[in-house]
């Protein structure tokens, strides 16, 4: 993985929005986090971790989110932002991209519907910026709120077997 630090100062100086808390009202709101019982797709927090953009698809998604979060951004400024992000020496990507490929991606971003937010993963716990919690404390909170409800228990398997039997399906072990 590339060890070049990200040049976030460029985004800050140009007042580019690259993170936004969800607009949905949370079920639980504390000074440290927001909890959504059914989850939210509206939490955008680009460039938070150490991971870099390493595919064209990821680059296109990042540019789409930046375009969505900055609707008043001039197209020329957006082109400059895209060129800055794809410059490997600025620490955002792990690969170089040709000018024509970048122009094609930018064109696709321009043609996208901004009335629909970009696809995002479902998040149930969103930690507030500057919460002061370290990674271990955050994991503890998530474990306490969500728990291990996604694990399969023997009762679940037994109920599934009963349901399959009621439907007349053959039950096999593989």
Language model: regions and residue ranges:
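Helix-turn-helix DNA-binding elements, focusing on the entry/boundary residues of the two helices
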Residues: 173-174
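Flexible coil/turn residues that form the inter-helical turn or adjacent wing/linker of helix-turn-helix
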Residues: 167-169
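Modules that initiate DNA replication and primer synthesis
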Residues: 2-165
């Amino acid at each position: 993985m590339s060890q070049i630090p990200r040049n976030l100062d460029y985004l800050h100086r140009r007042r580019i929005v690259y993170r936004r808390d969800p607009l949905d009202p949370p079920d639980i709101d504390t000074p440290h986090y927001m909890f959504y019982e059914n989850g939210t797709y509206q939490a955008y927090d680009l460039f938070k971790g150490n991971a870099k953009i390493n595919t064209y698809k990821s680059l296109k998604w990042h540019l789409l989110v930046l375009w969505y979060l900055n609707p008043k951004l001039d197209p020329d400024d957006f082109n400059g932002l895209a060129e800055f992000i794809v410059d490997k020496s600025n620490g955002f990507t792990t690969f170089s991209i040709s000018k024509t490929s970048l122009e094609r991606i930018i064109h696709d971003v321009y043609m996208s519907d901004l009335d629909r937010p970009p696809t995002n993963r479902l998040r149930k716990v969103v930690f507030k910026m500057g919460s002061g919690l370290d990674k271990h404390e955050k994991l503890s909170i998530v474990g306490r709120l969500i728990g291990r409800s996604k694990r399969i228990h023997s009762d679940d398997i037994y109920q599934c077997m009963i349901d399959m039997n009621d439907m007349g399906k053959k039950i096999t072990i593989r």
